[in-house]
Amino acid sequence: SLVGSEMCIRDSCDIEPDTYNLDPVSLEAHIQSVLAEGTLRPRAVVAVDFLGNPAKYDELDAICKKYGLLLIEDAAQGTGASYKGRKCGSFGDIATTSFFPSKPLGCYGDGGAVFTDDDEIAELLRSYKVHGKGPKGKYDNVRIGLNSRLDTLQAGVMLPKLAVLDQEIAMRQEIAERYHDAFAGKLQLPVITDGCVSAYAQYCMLAKDEAQRQNILDAMAAANIPSLIYYPTPLHVLDAFAPYPAEELPNAAHYARCNFGVPFSPYLTREDQDAVIRTVLEEL
């Protein structure tokens, strides 16, 4: 939303077909294409820890440094995940996260946070979150800002949840492993880069085509098992971006056509896991 509201021109890149994350090869190709055209100047890269799976930050950071770009980590689904021993939310020049209830660390309403180790950026963010306040106080507005302060109630909700976050991430790994064992070789499963730990904000698989996906979703609905598509439309073809040319991003398009998510929570009972596994396997 901020990218659009700040009149930035977005240039979407494709995802990797196995991790579903930003493809460093596609990214560099897009950067070179924009530079060669000469009309626009790339300024920043936004990398998403999609579904809780850490993006490839070594490669992305090297590309950003090569071309003098800011790297922004969207860790909304990645809180609790780690990339080569380093927690998500600590990469790039700026990292953002969400505390929406469906996220790995969620409150009971809306909330979020921005992380940076740059003092100038931090001071600017403190201004933006309180209506664009200046050094003289909150009524000294020096820029157009937002009302984006996390309220005390939501912070209080998250404190005990933060204390058990690592435990919940470990529980998510156990359930993901059960799903992996059950569906391996039958559906395309999420691939986690070596040395990384996914937060598994959701557990999504790819059917072979839309017809198979629909059969699976219908079977789950008949068994009163919830399911969702994360997400049905690639970002670059949303109506909000209609003024911009829709690039050909085949991996993103295939993911949107074939993905589906099954119930997933650190507290999902083994009985419920068995029901999910049994119902999906019956349609394969």
In which residue ranges do the predicted regions lie?
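Short, small-residue-biased leader/transition segments that mark boundaries at the very start
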Residues: S1-I9
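Short beta-strand->loop structural element characteristic of the AMP-binding/adenylate-forming
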Residues: R10-N21, L228
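Short, acidic/turn-prone active-site loops that include or flank metal/cofactor-
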Residues: I15-Y20, Q77, T233-P234
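Catalytic P-loop NTPase motifs of RecA-like helicase/translocase cores
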Residues: T19, P54, E73, G78-G80, ...
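PLP-dependent aminotransferase class I/II
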Residues: V25-L40, A44-V48, N53, Y57-E59, ...
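Hydrophobic "anchor" residues on beta-strands that sit immediately upstream
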Residues: L69-L70
